[in-house]
């Protein structure tokens, strides 16, 4: 990779970000396509988000991804947000078009494409979603679009779960309930169980958002976390013979849409998966 005075700079803002595979994905793809770009990470504490976004804009950063905990709050500091991202209430990709910061959400389609790669048909099924933040909003939208019968949103902060459940009910005219994380234990039947929280990510690798007993009830378990590749949540699934997947395919698929927004080209997903396997 050659960096010169015309190199376009892209990046990721979040807190933490040192676990991220996004630099590997984008930098290897820039190189493969002979695109003069570089992708770096910026660890931005919540109280510094506004200043960080202003700084990225002032420096002419061409685009950036947004990860936890900024997917919702970053919307306050953008010049434009797409209708879909506005509806979802979360942005994960920003394009700088001549000083105008435009926010997009590629998580929804990234998750849908991930389900297709996994050959997991969710139509008519019941889903439990752990967490009610920006990632959860995208997952709930994706599940609703793909035709699940119902969604239960479980979150430590009940009012966030309630607000999201009410919004999904209204937007999609479907059954969507909410409960606390602890109350998930009381459900006897859990078909699809999805973790959108950061519990299990470094440095909380010894924790799971729910108990092994809850995971064992599920038919399919999905963890948006991809590093570590097998969280305790997913270890519970493997131990109990439950089909499961981590968030790697969602990461790659949403990244391919972000890459397209920045460059006008999709990257080679097979090449990217090969690169990741080489690193992990």
UniProtKB/Swiss-Prot annotation:
Keywords: Amino-acid biosynthesis, Aromatic amino acid biosynthesis, NADP, Oxidoreductase. GO terms for molecular function: NADP binding; shikimate 3-dehydrogenase (NADP+) activity. It is an enzyme of class 1 (oxidoreductase). The active site is at 71 (proton acceptor). The keyword Oxidoreductase applies. GO terms for biological process: amino acid biosynthetic process; aromatic amino acid family biosynthetic process; chorismate biosynthetic process; shikimate metabolic process. Shikimate binds at residues 20-22, 67, 92, 107, 226. Its EC number is 1.1.1.25. It catalyses: shikimate + NADP(+) = 3-dehydroshikimate + NADPH + H(+). It comes from the Bacteria. Involved in the biosynthesis of the chorismate, which leads to the biosynthesis of aromatic amino acids. Catalyzes the reversible NADPH linked reduction of 3-dehydroshikimate (DHSA) to yield shikimate (SA). Belongs to the shikimate dehydrogenase family. This is Shikimate dehydrogenase (NADP(+)).
């Amino acid at each position: 990779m050659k960096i010169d005075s015309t190199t376009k700079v892209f990046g990721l803002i979040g807190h933490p970000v040192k676990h991220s595979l996004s630099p590997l994905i984008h930098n290897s793809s820039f190189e493969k396509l002979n695109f003069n770009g570089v992708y770096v990470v910026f660890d931005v504490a919540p109280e510094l988000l506004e200043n960080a976004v202003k700084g990225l804009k002032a420096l002419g950063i061409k685009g950036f991804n947004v990860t936890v905990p900024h997917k919702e709050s970053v919307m306050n500091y953008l010049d434009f947000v797409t209708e879909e991202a506005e509806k979802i209430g979360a942005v994960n990709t920003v394009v700088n078009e001549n000083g105008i910061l435009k926010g997009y959400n590629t998580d929804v389609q990234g998750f849908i494409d991930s389900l297709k790669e996994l050959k997991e048909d969710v139509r008519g099924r019941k889903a439990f979603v752990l967490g009610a933040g920006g990632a959860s909003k995208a997952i709930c939208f994706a599940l609703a679009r793909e035709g699940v019968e119902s969604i239960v949103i479980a979150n430590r902060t009940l009012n966030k779960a309630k607000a999201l459940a009410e919004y999904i009910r209204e937007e999609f005219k479907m059954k969507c309930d909410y409960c606390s994380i602890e109350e998930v234990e009381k459900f006897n039947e859990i078909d699809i169980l999805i973790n959108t929280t950061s519990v299990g990510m470094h440095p909380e690798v010894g924790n799971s958002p729910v108990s092994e007993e809850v995971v064992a009830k599920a038919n399919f378990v999905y963890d948006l976390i991809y590093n570590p590749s097998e969280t305790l949540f997913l270890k519970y699934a493997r131990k109990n013979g439950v089909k499961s997947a981590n968030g790697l395919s969602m990461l790659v698929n949403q990244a391919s849409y972000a890459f397209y927004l920045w460059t006008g080209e999709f990257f080679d997903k097979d090449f990217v998966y090969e690169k990741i396997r080489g690193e992990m």
